[in-house]
């Protein structure tokens, strides 16, 4: 199974279909056949400032449950799980742990920054400046337009970036796969490798419980402290 949070609801997931395709090629090259399943996610950024944020955390749990349903309803030999963002990455990791089937997580990468290293987190500051009439509406609209120039997780060390790093530190994602810029060809190449490795895990009968051990979690905690990642991962 190739499970992903692909969808058009926000830039973090809009490109994941391309990674799904690459993972499928990797699976095919190793003698397997991919079945693509999708449970798209919401964007915490879009959910802020209104009642939408009340649905954020529960969306993670429902996504994990739906992925479990997908796998249990039609048994598979292995899985590639592909996601980028705040609730989708934890949801995929939860599903992987629950299912304990040979599986690999493929991070969806990170979007590049806008002009002058503009990122989405700065829009709140510019919004306040606009309300105080310190910048013009035209300036504010330019910032809003350029804050998310392409696909991938938001380009700052928030929940999405943190969880991609944590997946790699836990050993459930390929080394070097976290936070690859989404516009680079290396991201697709890594997705294909993830598909290839999934077949290897199945043949070796290597499960997440064999990989995400106490030592792996201790390693992830140390990596988190070393990089000063977001505390919301807890």
State where each predicted segment sits.
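Conserved small/polar residues in nucleotide/adenosyl-binding loops
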Residues: 232-234
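Active-site cavity-forming subdomains of large catalytic enzyme subunits
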Residues: 56-219, 230
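Long, structured ligand/cofactor-binding scaffold of large enzymes
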Residues: 1-102
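Flexible, glycine-rich loop/tail regions that form catalytic "lids" or insertion modules at the edges
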Residues: 221-223
